Amino acid sequence: MTTYLAGFTLGISLILAIGAQNAFVLKQGIKQHHVFLVCFLCALSDAILISLGVAGFGYLVTQFPLIETIARYAGAAFLTWYGISSLRSAFTQKHIMNPEGDASKSAWQTALICLAFTWLNPHVYLDTLVLLGSISTQYEPHKWQFAIGAVCASFAFFFSLGYGAKLLIPIFKHARSWQILEFIIGFVMLALAISLLV
């Protein structure tokens, strides 16, 4: 149980920071747009990466830095595109809360954007494959309990964030609130894109 809690605690601490993925989950939760799908894909992606890290695949990332380089540049390009889209939306679109959710993006489109936020983020490989993978070796022969704890942390966090966001819906019935959120998200995405390149 102690090993499980160590994995859970470290897992939560690594994903609590406000980043591109968390901002996207929050936005989808407020819009009530494919919330389960987004939360599930984020948590499942983490589960896959954590499992690979504990299984020893973090070694590949350290031995082949090209993996991290490709993820960094592709991630920066994606974040730049998304950031510019959010800023444009903040200044040009009319924002009205739709209680039935935003139907402008299909489940497939939403899933692809969600997966891009996860798999094109070079930090996710360092956090899951390398960091969690290497720390799990301290818990031999119970390293899979550590992994289960970290995976549970991801599921708990993303579903809490996605579904907890509905508490903010009253605030986002006003168009100005959406504009501010879009502006903040756009700024954060562009800042993260720059941070990947410098």
Predicted regions and their residues:
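Transmembrane alpha-helical segments of integral membrane proteins
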Residues: 51-52, 131, 155-171
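Juxtamembrane boundary at the C-terminal end of a transmembrane helix
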Residues: 2, 194-198
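Juxtamembrane transmembrane-helix termini in multi-pass membrane transport proteins
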Residues: 2-69, 129-143
